[in-house]
């Protein structure tokens, strides 16, 4: 495999498990060192990245809290000296019918799914600007284009992710920084397996996808590595649907 990210430093939120961990390990294979921000420990991700010969930092961090993100940013810079790639992957996705949705639940979903990306960008974009190079990848969702019930709060955050991607790309293009988003389908992870979403595992791929199998985190890693590399240096402001052909636009 190529080393397109040789000696880059990638920050990944929610990198302890699932999609974030898969992207972290792929970036390490591509030659990057990794900094993970997550609320839970990441011993398996750490071990895998170290076994690939790369440096890794994992920090307990509530990515929705400005103080936590500021402290995390300082620790990353003191450890590695810079951040080249930022992957805003952390998110929550509880199914809640609109009639039952409280304002507190709405706010929490936005804080974790949207505010975190803003806070992380504020922490690391200044350094990217100084270096004249940077990559920001935001994880969104194909649910933005679909009819999905009990997801008003979540889909609203995913629309915000796409808008943030497009707008921030306009601000940062002159600084050598690209900003793109990846929109997966329903992905099998330990978290989704333990949630109400698991009821759709056997239904959704056959009903809506051209490739009729359930998506796994590994399916997203190639797209992420591409967007993080110089191969995608003239691509910005885009949302790439990596979803087995569910959405076509």
From Swiss-Prot:
GO terms for biological process: anaerobic ethylbenzene catabolic process; protein homotetramerization. NAD(+) binds at residues 17-19, 38, 61-63, 89, 93, 158, 184-187, 191. One of its GO terms (molecular function) is oxidoreductase activity, acting on the CH-OH group of donors, NAD or NADP as acceptor. It catalyses: (S)-1-phenylethanol + NAD(+) = acetophenone + NADH + H(+). InterPro entries: NAD(P)-bd_dom_sf, SDR, SDR_fam. Its EC number is 1.1.1.311. Substrate binds at residue 141. The keyword Oxidoreductase applies. The active site is at residue 154. It comes from the Bacteria. Keywords: NAD, Nucleotide-binding, Oxidoreductase. The reverse reaction is of biotechnological interest for the specific production of chiral alcohols from ketones. The keyword Nucleotide-binding applies. PANTHER family: 3-OXOACYL-(ACYL-CARRIER-PROTEIN) REDUCTASE, 3-OXOACYL-[ACYL-CARRIER-PROTEIN] REDUCTASE FABG. Homotetramer. Catalyzes the NAD-dependent stereospecific oxidation of (S)-1-phenylethanol to acetophenone in the degradation of ethylbenzene. Belongs to the short-chain dehydrogenases/reductases (SDR) family. This is (S)-1-Phenylethanol dehydrogenase. It comes from Aromatoleum aromaticum (strain DSM 19018 / LMG 30748 / EbN1). The gene is ped.
């Amino acid at each position: 495999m190529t080393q397109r990210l040789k000696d880059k430093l990638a920050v990944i939120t929610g990198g302890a498990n699932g999609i974030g961990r898969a992207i972290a390990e792929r970036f390490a294979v591509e030659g990057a060192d990794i900094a993970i921000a997550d609320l839970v420990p990441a011993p398996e991700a750490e071990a895998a990245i170290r076994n690939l010969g790369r440096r890794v930092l994992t920090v307990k961090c509530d990515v929705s809290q400005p103080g936590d993100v500021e402290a995390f940013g300082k620790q990353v810079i003191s450890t590695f000296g810079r951040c080249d790639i930022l992957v805003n992957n952390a998110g929550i996705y509880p199914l809640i019918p609109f009639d039952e949705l409280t304002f507190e639940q709405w706010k929490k979903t936005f804080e974790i799914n949207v505010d975190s990306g803003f806070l992380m960008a504020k922490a690391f974009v200044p350094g990217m600007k100084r270096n004249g190079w940077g990559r920001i990848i935001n994880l969104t969702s194909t649910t933005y284009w679909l009819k999905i019930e009990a997801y008003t709060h979540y889909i609203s955050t995913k629309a915000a992710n796409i808008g943030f991607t497009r707008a921030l790309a306009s601000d940062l293009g002159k600084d050598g920084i690209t900003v793109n988003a990846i929109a997966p389908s329903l992905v099998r992870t330990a978290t989704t397996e333990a949630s109400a979403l698991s009821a759709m595992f056997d239904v959704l791929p056959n009903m809506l996808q051209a490739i009729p199998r359930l998506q796994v985190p590994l399916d997203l890693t190639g797209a992420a590595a591409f967007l993080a590399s110089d191969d995608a240096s003239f691509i910005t402001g885009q949302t790439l649907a990596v979803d087995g052909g569910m959405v076509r636009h």
